[in-house]
UniProtKB/Swiss-Prot annotation:
Pfam families: RTTN_N
Protein name according to UniProt: Protein rotatin homolog
Cited InterPro entries: Rotatin (IPR030791), Rotatin_N (IPR029249)
Functional description taken from the UniProt entry: Participes in the structural integrity of both centrioles and basal bodies and in centriole cohesion. Participates in the later stages of centriole assembly through the interaction with Rcd4 leading to the centriole to centrosome conversion.
Provenance organism: Drosophila melanogaster (Fruit fly)
Annotated stretches, region: Disordered: 141-166
PANTHER family (alphabetical): ROTATIN (PTHR31691:SF1)
Compartments in which it is found: Cytoplasm, Cytoskeleton, Microtubule organizing center, Centrosome, Centriole
One cellular-component annotation, GO: cytoplasm
Keyword Cytoplasm: yes
Domain of life: Eukaryota
Similarity-based family: Belongs to the rotatin family.
Subunit structure: Interacts with Rcd4;this complex is recruited to daughter centrioles before their conversion to centrosomes.
Keywords annotated in UniProt: Cytoplasm, Cytoskeleton
Length: 1977
């Protein structure tokens, strides 16, 4: 990069004068030169030196020469001059009138040329002059577009459209601008939309507009000069440029979407300080509405045809909806309505197409249907968006809008994902019952019914009966006789099951009634035919005594009311009613009556008791049968025969009831016979003598036959008076009358008066209702009726009683039913009728009562009318009535009603539309897959013809199968013979892709790529080929943008393998047209951003180099837009693995720095250029930083400090650019360059003195600037952190103080914005979590550089503020990632930095803050839920180590682990994954676990984390399989521990706790942790990479340490280790090492390579031995297998030579042997044995260690070395086995006491320190317990030692115990007895005084231990054998023993607790008794 500014270009005066040269050639050459320089400078924004007035004059004078050459170019230069910044000079010098006059002259000169372009330029120039001279200016909004006026011929509509757009904009369509451009950017944008009038140039200019659009924030286009609206205006042009305008609009919308998302991001926020009156912009929603309206105007004429513009318009509509979604804004109803109207129009067309030729139908439907599908999806998305964003949406209206989509079966079936989404949408729109539920119900019914017509899905028997309602819903609609037969067959087939399944019987009854009641006569006739067949068969089986149904008795069936089919009164009633209907055929009418006749004829076949079961079936329909019998003689005879008293098998009650019906018969003879029979029955009744005689006056045969014939019938309305709406007023009267009725002893006349008054009162309907509420009301009336007919009673009350009964029966239907089934009431009423036939009123009332009782199930009575549900004519009924046929709803009627409702609500009662919908639905249900639908597959079904699919329907289905139609387009493309046809086909394919996106089938996608590749592989050869090539490029861009794998992989492979591909050739063509280059670049960018796999080949590097060269070429040719296209590609290529050397990376970095500098501006114009260059630079820098190997990168650092300074200076200048993204990339580049330069930066920083305070101060200033974008503030902070080590701690601290950073950071915490998205309205300044992170990171860095500063930091309020931030974490709702990262990565890291020097601060603050600790656990949970949280978990682990160190916080964690064990397990296990091996994350995890295990060893078992984890049960999967770093274990109880441990209702006793000796029912957490550690151990040690010659890795050491500590602390882990054979693996590893021939013998190896090189082996051995030592220090780690013990012993012996080279290894190994023998008897045996191939056993080596460590000389005044203690302990342990004792005896170890415990010590003897001597005495004490070690020796030394040692000292006690042990062996008795010093010693011991109480003598002992040992020795020596007893009796010693015994006995007898607190007192007393007893024997 050159640091010098290039000199400004100039147009010399002499050069300008050449414009008026006489030579035409000179004039033209001068014009070319001036035009090139002038225009280029204007485009690049570079200054140019010239005289504007002179240039203008010369250009005007140009037209003085005839003929005028290239007038359009000269006028264009004048226009550019007037628009440029140089126009001011012209305006000042030349008045408006003069300028206008000169232009008039030019117009006259050019008048003859008739050039459209020239006239347009002159018109525009006139308008421009008005603006420049402020002459008659128009409003800003109009002027912004009027300056870009379009010629009148082509764009009169455009002008009107432009004006209309602005006229329609209202104040509410504007909003405050998000940001606003500077004047230079406004001028540039004006020039961008100052489009030429030539269509070719216009298209080129639009392409440039798309390329340059990225320079500006998209909101600029919604502000003057309103670029967006100008593009909308250009859509109305008719010059063929619509496709380019739409492409620009699509690009603008996508940029707008990106801008909206960017503005929502917190990192893009900066505190605004704009005034409230800042500029306005058109609202995005308003702009989208304008665009959508314009698009719909354009697409309406094209809905039924396909042009090159269709797909762009449709894509625009889709992008509009997507922009609304990104904006989170509702879509205005006007926009939705526009789409809905188009959807309706297209659907109406598609549904109306008719024809019989499939080809013609498909041609008519293909494009309209395709666009219909697109708009269906758009409408669907619009309504779905409004549900989310419009809370006040009219859901009913929204549902009406999408109703056409819901009914588009072809659309939903072809797009199942849309169907699912639409169902969800409809359910969300339905707040209550929805008409769509009816449609869904019908469709489900059709589906079930159609399944019945398919053999594979047909239901039979009970299953079909259970589903009958769904089938019957559509039975009539389908008109299928097959379904009717299946349903009836199911009813008959299930007859055997009805007895045991009442629900099935009920369903069968309902089904049969539904079938009988079918409205379709054809289907009903079929049912009757089937019923006749079944019923006759059953009846004949009675006659022939055969079986009707296998397994069922005929009589049993009839008892179940089954005669051929199940029967119910309702079914019979319906059949009888149908027998009288006019539309029923005569045959069917006859059959309807034959059925009950057949049932009644069973009277002659069945037993009486069986017929009595059958007759109740007929009783409810008996009124109807008798009514029909009037005109049906056979029926009359059958009924009469059944009721005949002499032959009837019925009960008399039923028989009497039947004859009463005939009293209403129109035939007098029938009535007479019935009356006579009734009278006869009444006379023959029992207890007849109790009542008044019925025939006392008239003989029976002379009784009138018209007793119940009331002519005319009594008017029902006169029974009850009309009541008002008021409440019943006669309540008191009714109560009084009722009380009188209840009285028993009232007179008859009073009772009659009472009944009469009550009768009158009950004419009120409400009074009847009140009377019905009386408890005994009905009973009193019935008693009155009964008493009135008794003999001897007054009959005066009979008439009012019957009248009251009549009214009450009408009023209460329940009472009526009860009375109708009471036989006594019939007899009472008939007696009254026969007693007083002459009383008309009584006869009338009785007749009406009988009518009510007989017809009770047929009548419904109200206050003003009586209704019968069937026509009872010709019976003569006694009261007037109305007939209302009661329709019982069935599934069929419900289905028909549903069908009508759906037709009304969904199809607007358009039957044709509804029929088509159901035809399509039937076809889809039958054929399942749209592609398999054929006319033949549906025509074979037994359904109505109107429901079978037609040819037009099939065409609609096929046109909806987009993959199939797209395949047809490929065929059409192959058959194209013209370029235009091919282009049209490609446009159609693009239209298909608008809706299909990336959901193409593999075959279609592959064919699509083949088509594209065929035409883009070679470069076009002519103009026609060029157009096809561009259309194919456009198609290729679409495919790759939709991420179609075939296109992506295909193009990638083609570019990699085909070096002559058109892309390769055209990209290197410097003359390539801009539009073609732009399309190629779009292809490449989409490819690079969507490529599925990153090839390992070097294709990207080569491509990068080629593109860089091409960009350079274009730049040299000043083809700047070409360069922009290339830079966009390079941006993506730079992200790939370029495989460049460091030198290449540095070279290209400098190249792009120079390229960036060549077009540097401070405004938005050209910012995309800068972004691309800087992004490429950043990527190259990243490659350079992370290049391998690292050392080579240092060589690429530029040695020239000056060059690095220039680069840094350049980046710093761009840090002040107007574009925020440029600034951000500049800071990133700056940081990367600082990293690359390393130490050079320290030399450069002082030279950056042009920055106030230098670069670090500039970084801090930017960081604290609230008006800067958050991202840039963060980047500046990161750069400062990079610079801190370079400027030093003191300078950094000084800067922090100067900027008061701690205070600023604390204040920023108050306004922290803790979400990643910004609110819609921000009040006051905000600070992102990332900015806060920078503040915290600076503090952390400062503490690391200057630890003593941490104290000052801890005293600042910032630390408490950070604690409060941590407390903001919510345990329930998931927090934002930036907040989690701030807390986990920065705040926790800062707190952990305070541990070293300021732990007390942490203990006093966060360790005691329970809220902080609780949020710390919440933070762990949030971090673990992220995808890549490794870098965030490390600070959390550091904090965990701190909390474990503090007792208070450690207790809190232990308590929390009880409630959240799974959280802690996730925390621990995540870092133990093998993928994280050797990572810092894993190392900290292992450290944390080691601390947990260590604390478990120190703490009580019940109060440690490990103990709680052992209680936590979980299911554990294979530990070797894990995905993405997550552990595959599943907690049995989420956030809870095992139920058997923590169930609140369970007992907390020991029985409920887990114990190691219990069977493991579930894997606990300790075992899981062990498995993870074991897996890591295997990864370290069982891999081929293991080498003992290399130092062990840190992780390797930590894993072994953690394993050892876990196995020491956990019994469960020990068991798991046994199962996984961990010990065997360790032994195998050590064995392999010892067998390694490369190493061999230890001494030889060390001698060969030197001691320093053997340290790696020592270290590896130390790691394993230390793990084993920790492990086996636990008493639970017992080795019981002999083979394992032997192997370990052999390994330890073989390792022994290495111990001489490491004192620490020797110490640890001896300790391991000590622990092994401590807990394992087998180990003691194997250590004692001599192993094969070895001269000494391991026990011998231990003895040598003990001997060496004892006898070696030690430095005076130094702590004694106790390394012999473990060795002696091994010797002690081995004493337990015979082998060990034998080996020890052979070593003569007791000879050591000659050295360490001489009998007569002198100065020449070895001085042994007391601890060493005690250790040896301890060994001797144990060894002397056995015969091989109990030999009496060194007696004098022991005695002397005892005498020299103070009483009760450890050494003295050990010596006494050794003597005691010697006394136990008889071989030592003679010598000991004869040893006077020994006896005297015992006497002296017994003479010692012992304190008996606290006040006893002060010099006394506090224990009887020595006395006990002395007495024990005396007992063993003298208590056995007369000789020895006699020797003792003659000594003073015996007297001492007696005195001691007496003293002890007296003391214990007088005061039991005298020696209770003195040790060994009781033991001594017992031994004295035993001794004395022995002496007495």
């Amino acid at each position: 990069m050159s640091t010098k500014q290039s000199p400004a270009l100039q147009l010399a005066e002499g050069q300008l004068t050449k414009l008026t040269s006489e030579s035409e050639e000179i004039r033209m050459r001068a014009l070319d030169q001036i035009e090139t320089r002038f225009i280029r400078c204007l485009q690049l924004g570079e200054p140019i030196q010239f005289k504007p007035v002179l240039l203008l004059k010369q250009l005007i004078r140009w037209f003085g020469y005839t003929p005028p050459l290239v007038p359009d170019r000269v006028l264009a230069m004048i226009m550019e001059l007037l628009r440029s910044e140089y126009a001011e000079a012209v305006i000042r010098k030349i008045p408006y009138e003069r300028f206008k006059a000169e232009l008039q002259k030019v117009r006259r000169v050019l008048h003859k040329q008739e050039s459209k372009r020239v006239s347009e330029l002159l018109d525009d120039m006139n308008l421009l002059l008005l603006e420049k001279y402020n002459i008659d200016r128009v409003t800003p909004s109009v002027s912004s577009l009027s300056s870009n006026d379009i010629p009148s011929q082509a764009t009169e509509s455009a002008d009107s459209s432009s004006n209309q757009i602005y006229d329609n904009l209202k104040p509410e369509d504007y909003e405050p601008s998000w940001s606003h451009p500077c004047l230079d950017d406004v001028a540039t944008m004006k020039s961008m939309i100052d489009l030429p009038r030539n269509s070719v140039e216009l298209q080129l200019q639009l392409t440039e507009l798309i390329i340059r659009m990225g320079d500006y924030p998209t909101e600029y286009f919604l502000q003057p000069p309103f670029v967006f609206l100008h593009l909308v205006q250009l859509q109305t042009m008719t010059d063929g440029s619509l496709i380019h305008v739409n492409r620009a609009l699509i690009a603008c919308l996508r940029l707008l979407q990106q801008r909206i998302l960017l503005r929502r991001n917190t990192l893009s926020y900066a505190d605004r300080f704009d005034p409230p009156s800042r500029p306005k912009q058109v609202k995005v929603v308003s702009a989208l509405v304008i665009l959508l309206e314009n698009c719909m105007k354009l697409i309406r004429p094209l809905l039924f045809s396909c042009t090159n513009d269709n797909w762009h318009i449709m894509e625009l509509i889709v992008e509009i909806v997507r922009t609304h979604d990104v904006l989170s804004s509702k879509i205005p109803l006007v926009s939705i309505t526009l789409i809905a109207d188009a959807v309706k129009s297209l659907l109406a067309y598609c549904n109306s197409v008719e024809g019989s030729c499939m080809t013609q139908l498909m041609d008519s439907l293909r494009i309209p249907r395709l666009q219909s599908l697109i708009l269906n999806g758009v409408l669907h998305d619009m309504v779905a968006l409004n549900i989310n964003y419009d809370k006040r949406m009219d859901r009913r209206q929204a549902k009406a809008l999408i109703q056409p989509i819901v009914l588009d079966s072809a659309y939903l079936s072809g797009m199942p994902e849309r169907m699912k989404s639409l169902n969800t949408l409809i359910s969300s729109l339905d707040s209550g019952p929805s008409p769509d539920e009816e449609l869904i119900k019908l469709k489900r019914a059709y589906s079930v019914a159609l399944n019945q017509l398919h053999p594979n899905t047909e239901l039979t028997g009970s299953l079909l009966i259970q589903k009958y309602r769904q089938v019957c819903l559509v039975l009539v609609q389908l008109g299928s006789e097959t379904l009717v037969k299946q349903l009836f067959g199911a009813v008959v087939k299930c007859i055997p099951f009805y007895a045991g399944n009442l629900k099935l019987r009920k369903d069968a009854d309902e089904l049969l009634y539904t079938l009988v009641d079918l409205p379709a006569l054809k289907l009903r006739s079929l049912i009757y035919r089937l019923m006749i067949k079944s019923t006759v068969a059953h009846f004949h089986s009675f006659m022939n005594k055969t079986v009707y149904m296998t397994g069922c008795s005929n009589v049993d069936l009839i008892r179940q009311h089954i005669l051929g089919v199940p029967l119910t009164p309702l079914l019979l009633r319906r059949m009888i009613i149908q027998s009288s209907e006019a539309n029923t055929s005569e045959r069917m009418q006859q059959w309807c009556l034959d059925y009950p006749i057949m049932i009644m004829k069973l009277n002659a076949i069945l037993a009486p008791q069986d017929f009595s079961v059958v007759f109740p079936l007929l009783l409810p329909v008996l009124p109807l049968l008798i009514s029909r019998s009037v005109t049906h003689k056979i029926l009359h005879n059958v009924i009469w025969n059944v009721l005949e008293p002499d032959s009837s098998r019925l009960d008399p009650q039923l028989m009497l009831r039947g004859y009463v019906y005939f009293m209403f018969h129109p035939d007098g003879e029938v009535r007479s016979e019935a009356t006579t029979t009734i009278a006869y029955v009444l006379q023959c009744q029992e207890q007849t003598n109790r009542y008044l005689p019925t025939a006392s006056n008239v003989p029976v045969e002379h009784i009138a036959n018209d007793l119940c014939i009331i002519q005319p019938p009594f008017c029902y309305r006169s029974i009850f008076i009309k009541c008002s709406d008021e409440r019943f007023q006669g309540q008191r009267s009714l109560d009084a009358l009722f009380r009188l009725l209840q009285a028993k002893d009232i007179k008859s006349n009073i009772r009659k008066s009472t009944m009469t008054q009550l009768n009158v009162l009950l004419r009120n309907w409400r009074a009847c209702e009140e009377f019905s509420t009386k408890e005994d009301g009905y009973r009193l009336i019935m008693e009155s009726l009964h008493n009135a007919l008794k003999k001897g009673n007054d009959t005066d009350i009979l008439l009012p009683t019957v009248s009251i009964l009549m009214k009450l029966l009408f009023n209460d239907d329940e009472f009526r039913l009860e009375v109708a089934n009471t036989f006594g009431v019939y007899t009472l009423l008939l007696r009254a009728l026969f007693l007083f036939p002459h009383l008309e009123q009584l006869r009338q009332d009785v007749s009406i009562c009988l009518f009510q009782m007989l017809f009770q199930n047929c009548i419904t009575s109200t206050e003003d009318k009586l209704v019968l549900n069937a026509n009872m004519e010709p019976l003569i009924l006694p009261v007037t009535y109305e007939i209302e046929h009661k329709v019982i709803p069935t599934a069929v009627t419900e289905g028909l009603e549903l069908q009508q409702n759906v037709e009304a609500t969904h199809f607007g009662r358009d039957r044709a539309k509804a029929a088509q919908h159901w035809r399509l639905y039937m076809a889809y249900r039958v054929c399942q897959v749209p592609s398999s639908i054929t006319l033949e597959s549906v025509s074979a079904l037994d359904i109505r013809e109107s429901l079978k699919i037609k040819m037009a329907d099939l065409a609609l289905v096929r046109s909806s199968d987009l993959n199939e139609q797209l395949s047809c387009q490929f065929i059409a493309a192959e058959n194209c013979s013209k370029h235009e046809d091919l282009q049209k086909t490609v446009s159609a394919i693009q239209l298909f892709l608008v809706v299909l996106r990336n959901s193409l089938s593999d075959t279609v996608a592959e064919n699509l790529w083949k088509l594209i590749h065929k035409y883009i592989r070679l470069a076009p050869g002519n103009e026609a080929d060029d157009k096809v090539y561009k259309s194919m490029l456009d198609l290729c861009v679409t495919c790759i943008r939709f991420s179609q794998p075939h296109a992506i992989n295909g193009l990638s492979y083609a570019l990699e393998t085909d070096h002559h591909h058109s892309f390769q050739l055209l990209l290197h063509d410097s003359q390539i047209s801009l539009d073609k280059l732009f399309l190629i670049c779009q292809c490449m960018m989409q490819l690079l951003s969507n490529e599925l796999s990153d090839d390992s080949m070097n294709w990207y590097g080569k491509f990068f180099m080629q593109l860089s060269a091409v960009a350079k070429t274009h730049f040299e040719l000043r083809q700047l837009q070409h360069v922009r296209c290339i830079l966009c590609m390079l941006r993506f290529v730079s992200e790939r693995n370029l495989k460049f050397s460091n030198a290449q990376l540095m070279s290209y970095s400098q190249h792009f720095i120079q390229l960036s500098s060549n077009l540097r501006t401070s405004t938005q114009t050209g910012s995309e250029w800068q972004r691309d260059c800087l992004y490429i630079i950043c990527q190259l820098q990243i490659h350079l930083i992370y290049q391998e190997p690292k050392a080579s990168s240092k060589a690429s650092i530029p040695n020239d400090v000056g060059a690095s300074y220039k680069v840094l200076r350049y980046f710093l200048t761009l840090c002040g650019h107007g574009d925020s993204e440029v600034r951000a990339l500049s800071w990133v580049s700056l940081a990367n360059w600082i990293t690359i330069c390393g130490s050079q930066v320290a030399e450069i920083l002082p030279r950056l003195d042009f920055l106030p305070g230098g670069l670090p101060a500039c970084c801090l200033t930017t960081l604290t600037d609230a008006h800067e974008m958050m991202l840039i503030r963060e980047l500046a902070g990161r750069v400062f952190i990079l610079l801190m080590p370079l400027i030093g701690a003191e300078s950094s601290l000084e800067l922090l103080r100067k900027h008061d950073l701690l205070k600023t950071a604390y204040n920023s915490l108050k306004a922290i914005h803790d979400t990643p998205w910004m609110f819609k309205k921000i009040v006051g300044e905000r600070h992102s979590c990332e900015v806060i992170s920078c503040y915290v990171a600076i503090c952390t860095k400062m503490v690391a550089m200057k630890p003593e500063w941490c104290a000052a930091l801890c005293g600042h309020s910032l630390m408490s503020g950070l604690s409060d931030v941590m407390k903001k974490l919510k345990s329930q709702a998931s927090c934002s990632i930036p907040l989690v990262e701030l807390c986990a990565s920065q705040i926790c890291e800062l707190y952990s930095m305070c541990y070293t020097n300021n732990f007390e601060f942490l203990k006093m603050t966060i360790c005691r803050d329970s809220v902080f600790l609780q949020n710390y656990l919440t933070l762990i949970n949030d971090v673990l839920s992220l995808e890549c949280p490794e870098y965030m978990v490390i600070p959390l682990l550091k904090m965990f180590l701190i909390f474990c160190t503090d007792s208070n916080s450690n207790s809190f964690l232990i308590e929390q682990i009880k409630n959240k064990p799974s959280l802690f397990m996730d925390f621990f296990l995540f870092g133990l994954h093998v993928k994280l091996i050797n990572s810092p994350f894993q190392r900290f995890t292992l450290s944390a676990l080691s601390l947990v295990f260590t604390k478990a060893q120190l703490a009580a078992y019940d109060i440690s984390m490990l103990s709680e984890l052992e209680k936590f049960e979980l299911a554990f999967s294979d530990p070797d399989i894990a995905k993405d770093g997550k552990q595959e274990f599943e907690s049995k109880k989420k956030q809870s521990v095992s139920q058997c441990i923590y169930d609140e209702s369970s007992d907390n006793s020991d029985d409920n706790k887990q114990r190691p000796n219990h069977a493991i029912q579930a894997t606990n957490a300790a075992i899981i942790i062990f498995h993870r550690l074991d897996q890591l151990f295997d990864r370290y040690y069982l891999s081929k990479a293991l080498n003992f010659l290399e130092l062990p890795a840190v992780g390797q050491v930590q894993v072994c340490e953690a394993l050892g500590e876990l196995l020491k602390a956990s019994t469960w882990a020990v068991k798991a280790a046994g199962e996984s054979k961990l010990l065997g693996k360790v032994v195998h590893i050590l064995d392999d090492f010892l067998n390694d021939e490369k190493i061999g013998n230890a001494a030889v190896y060390v001698k060969r390579v030197g001691p320093h090189k053997a340290q790696s082996i020592i270290s590896n051995l130390l790691v394993l031995i230390n793990m084993l030592s920790q492990w086996h220090s636990s008493p639970n780690s017992e080795i019981i297998q002999t083979s394992m013990a032997a192997n370990i012993a052999k390994i330890l012996i073989r390792i022994w030579p290495w111990l001489s080279h490491s004192y620490h290894l020797k110490k640890v190994t001896v300790q391991l042997i000590m622990f092994l023998t401590e807990h394992s008897f087998e180990m003691c045996k194997q250590i004692s044995l001599l192993q094969s191939g070895h001269a000494q056993s391991l026990l011998h080596l231990m003895a040598r260690v003990a001997d060496f460590e004892t006898t070696k000389k030690e430095i005076p005044n130094k702590e004694p070395s106790l390394n012999m203690v473990p060795a002696l302990r091994v010797m002690v342990n081995c004493c337990c086995c015979t082998e060990g004792r034998l080996s020890l005896s052979k070593m003569n170890l007791l000879d050591m006491f000659d050295t360490i415990l001489p009998a007569n010590p002198c100065s020449t003897h070895l001085k042994v320190r007391p601890p060493v001597l005690i250790a040896w005495l301890g060994f001797w004490e144990v060894f002397s317990r056995y015969d091989v070690g109990g030999k009496a020796c060194h007696l004098q030394s022991l005695i002397n030692t005892i005498r020299r040692s103070p009483p009760l000292s450890h050494k003295r006690i050990l010596c006494l115990r050794i003597l005691r042990n010697m006394c136990f062996f008889n071989g030592n008795r003679p010598r000991l007895v004869e040893l006077a010093d020994f006896i005297n010693l015992l006497r002296d011991i017994l003479e010692q005084r012992v304190q008996k109480a606290p006040t006893s003598e002060k010099n006394g002992l506090n224990s009887f231990e020595e006395h006990r040992l002395a007495v024990l020795m005396l007992w063993k020596l003298f208590g056995f054998g007369a000789k020895y007893k006699g020797m003792l009796r003659g000594t003073k010693l015996f007297k001492l023993l007696i005195g001691l015994r007496v003293e002890m006995s007296v003391v214990f007898s007088e005061e039991e607790n005298k020696y209770a607190g003195v040790p060994y007192a009781n033991d001594l007393a017992k031994l004295l008794e035993k001794l004395m007893e022995s002496m007495r024997q």
